[in-house]
């Protein structure tokens, strides 16, 4: 049985991602062929990269823990990658050939060593103005890229890749045990179905290597919080010429100091003086695209009233229609008054009381409370 990935990295099965990365970097530095003359350095370095490639991916790691080293390694060598995040093994796929043989199925066709690369996820935070206008962002991340020395074949230039003579290119051998036929990964080609006699020195026969990447991604106008944008073929490069995975950019929009977002509508709190509330008028309010517009305040506006500015909200993806901006009125009462202001308010107070006494509405309301 092969040494499992946790043993290769020297960590426990409960190790955190931080512990895994720390162990990987330490071992990769120790066994990198360019920094040591040890005979088994290249083999060890390849094992370390393979182990970390699986355990750093939560979905691959879960599948590895569930199915075990040998089954996982065999399934992955057959290209058992999923569409979202890499390896999503299906128990029916893994043991499908076993039950096919039990029911009288024939021998499988030769497998391909060109496993699809894993999908990648990148979290990108933008502000509300960027979400409104749309923006092009440069992002940086590390991933497996196609080897530019062997062009993804995994073999030195000019060297041919041959079909494994032990399994006939199937990637598996079969053992008859009584009534049952058990299939296991080929010991000679490790389930690849092919033999690389002279592996590429740069990628160690994998057809890909780890590299820091820079990529420009376009964020469309009107993007909403938690939107996922797919970039086909920008994920990890496949093994030995396999198709690349996809890159998924998950958008998070920062909270804004003024606006709250509700779909395509924007909400904001608008403070006005009690004089403007009583008499009405116009007031300038800021808008998301920049600048200000005039908002009409009707006479008699009350605290908590809501006034709407049509088509002054967020833009919508793939649409010319915009949401609205809804202003929530907050009437401010002055804390400090001049002598003249106080006199005017006292006069206003007297007139207000007289009006209520004359129309009887105030006394009728008070009377109803005690009846």
Curated annotation (Swiss-Prot):
Cellular-component GO terms for this entry: cytoplasm
Cofactors (names): Zn(2+)
UniProt subcellular location: Cytoplasm
Ranges that cross the membrane: none
Major subcellular site: cytoplasm
InterPro entries referenced in this protein's UniProt entry, alphabetically: DnaJ, DnaJ_C, DnaJ_domain, DnaJ_domain_CS, HSP40/DnaJ_pept-bd, HSP_DnaJ_Cys-rich_dom, HSP_DnaJ_Cys-rich_dom_sf, J_dom_sf
Swiss-Prot/TrEMBL keywords: Chaperone, Cytoplasm, DNA replication, Metal-binding, Repeat, Stress response, Zinc, Zinc-finger
Span of zinc fingers (CR-type): 134-212
Positions that bind Zn(2+) 2: 164, 167, 186, 189
Pfam family, one: DnaJ_CXXCXGXG
Functional summary from the UniProt entry: Participates actively in the response to hyperosmotic and heat shock by preventing the aggregation of stress-denatured proteins and by disaggregating proteins, also in an autonomous, DnaK-independent fashion. Unfolded proteins bind initially to DnaJ; upon interaction with the DnaJ-bound protein, DnaK hydrolyzes its bound ATP, resulting in the formation of a stable complex. GrpE releases ADP from DnaK; ATP binding to DnaK triggers the release of the substrate protein, thus completing the reaction cycle.
Subunit structure: Homodimer.
Family label: Belongs to the DnaJ family.
Protein name, UniProt field: Chaperone protein DnaJ
Highest classification ranks of the organism: Bacteria, Pseudomonadati, Pseudomonadota, Alphaproteobacteria, Rickettsiales
